[in-house]
Amino acid sequence: MSGTTFDHLVVAARTLDEGAAWVMSKLGVAPVAGGKHPTMGTHNRLLFIGQRRFLEVIAIDPDAPAPGRPRWFDLDDPGMRTKLEHGPALIHWVERTDDMDAALREYPQPVEVLALARGSYRWRIGVPKDGRRPGGGTLPTLIQWEGSLHPAEALPDTGCRLERFAAKEGRIEAVFSTPSGTRTIP
């Protein structure tokens, strides 16, 4: 897809604590507090993995009311919930665009564009109305950050870098350089 670039990886977990512990066990570094997404009833933790790149650990926020729509990234899907009972997983990736409307003209699946905000961050994100990952996980989610602020710029640099990543048939593999060596998350 033209006009997009990698933005972040998505790790889903039943709880943020489980997700953070999983990332720590895989990469040897821990994500830091992110924030809440009231529209989706989720919250997250974030890990810097390079310039304008981050890894997001996301989970349903037990303190949030149920959203008036299905949550993103399949988090309401019974199959995803069963999968996460066995532990957190790298489930998706998000690509950034500077022109959401142009990117969506090339995008092979209809999505609803949500305008969201948290603190000084503002973004538009394309989410299928059913909350599932686009293309059953074979297409990236599209995001457009409004203004010049990007969450990765505020994250501590732990020395973890995404070296390469591949998505094929809904499966993701990411290779990282970390302070303790090269690590791969399948």
List each model region and its residues.
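Active-site-proximal cofactor/substrate-binding loop regions of enzyme domains
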Residues: 1-57, 65
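Eukaryotic phosphotyrosine signaling hubs
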Residues: 6, 88-91
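Glycine-centered loop/turn motif at secondary-structure junctions
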Residues: 27-28, 72, 108
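Vicinal oxygen chelate
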Residues: 35, 43-48, 53-61, 76-79, ...
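Long, hydrophobic/aromatic-enriched structural stretches that serve as scaffold segments
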Residues: 60-61, 66-71
